[in-house]
Amino acid sequence: MTATLERRESFSLWERFCSWITSTENRLYIGWFGVLMIPTLLTATSCYIIAFIAAPPVDIDGIREPVAGSLMYGNNIITGAVIPSSNAIGVHFYPIWEAASLDEWLYNGGPYQLIVLHFLLGVASYMGREWELSYRLGMRPWIFVAFSAPVAAASAVFLVYPIGQGSFSDGMPLGISGTFNFMLVFQAEHNILMHPFHMAGVAGVFGGSLFSAMHGSLVTSSLIRETSEIESANYGYKFGQEEETYNIVAAHGYFGRLIFQYASFNNSRALHFFLAAWPVVGIWLTALGVSTMAFNLNGFNFNQSVVDSQGRVINTWADIINRADLGMEVMHERNAHNFPLDLASNEVLPVAVNAPAVNG
């Protein structure tokens, strides 16, 4: 009888750590991107909560007129926000150690940069983690490609736009009313509603909602009948059952008759690719549009483009939008400038649109 003795393999602490990090058996997959994602998102979240509750007012315009954004300084959930970094800081990197004191860092809006930069690192790492888990499981990589759309949109408003405009004070405030203010000022300065890429994004978001609702309702309505003709089809299945209940042929036939034949998909993979690609491409284009408007390549300008035979302007909706833009331009940063350049550089415009004289 021969006995064979084998030396038991011993794994170092590092090897066991690597195995645990990359294991797909964990309840929540961590991955190497998760090693970066977890601390950055925890930092951004904790700083955001503290700043939203207790941050002191921030000198956003750099003119020694602080703006309060936290709950402890009189705001509520709707009006509260983390105020962007001061215009006096510009696009300089402004960590805590660059300030002379913590009070100075808070006064100049340092928490905004800390939150935004950690958040962008965190969501980019989350996107990489989606790819990493797909790779480990032998899946295709399209989940992370789809998530790149909201990552691109967040990067556009929080990073690219402030860089293009020369200051983090132009970034989107981290709050509800601050987001609305950002949207109104963006329209006033860049005419985003007249930008083709924004139009594509609107089509992507609303179209994606429509297609999602249509698809979900069709799937829910298309049952494989398990009952007789005299019983309701609803008795033939239980909510959440594992067995297939969806008949794509029936759904295809219904929708093809409702609209027309070629408006319906009879291939499940093509259908779901379309459902994913439509909103993703739309949001990609919107992010690209915001990134170009960051450098003042703005939306279309059709102001005063229609004139009569005497050279008098016939106002169109473009002129109405332009007047609204000028009004918003005047209202924002009311103390940072004496007169907006958009008004100072053009000829004087009447406040109201003149109605034509009617001879009765």
Curated annotation (Swiss-Prot):
Which keywords does the record carry? Calcium, Chlorophyll, Chloroplast, Chromophore, Electron transport, Herbicide resistance, Iron, Magnesium, Manganese, Membrane, Metal-binding, Oxidoreductase, Photosynthesis, Photosystem II, Plastid, Thylakoid, Transmembrane, Transmembrane helix, Transport
Give the UniProt record's GO annotations in the biological process aspect: photosynthetic electron transport in photosystem II; response to herbicide
Catalysed reactions listed for this entry: 2 a plastoquinone + 4 hnu + 2 H2O = 2 a plastoquinol + O2
Binding-site list for chlorophyll a ChlzD1:
H118
Record-stated family:
Belongs to the reaction center PufL/M/PsbA/D family.
Q: Can you state the subunit structure given in the record?
A: PSII is composed of 1 copy each of membrane proteins PsbA, PsbB, PsbC, PsbD, PsbE, PsbF, PsbH, PsbI, PsbJ, PsbK, PsbL, PsbM, PsbT, PsbX, PsbY, PsbZ, Psb30/Ycf12, at least 3 peripheral proteins of the oxygen-evolving complex and a large number of cofactors. It forms dimeric complexes.
Protein name listed in UniProt: Photosystem II protein D1
Q: Which organism is it from?
A: Heterosigma akashiwo
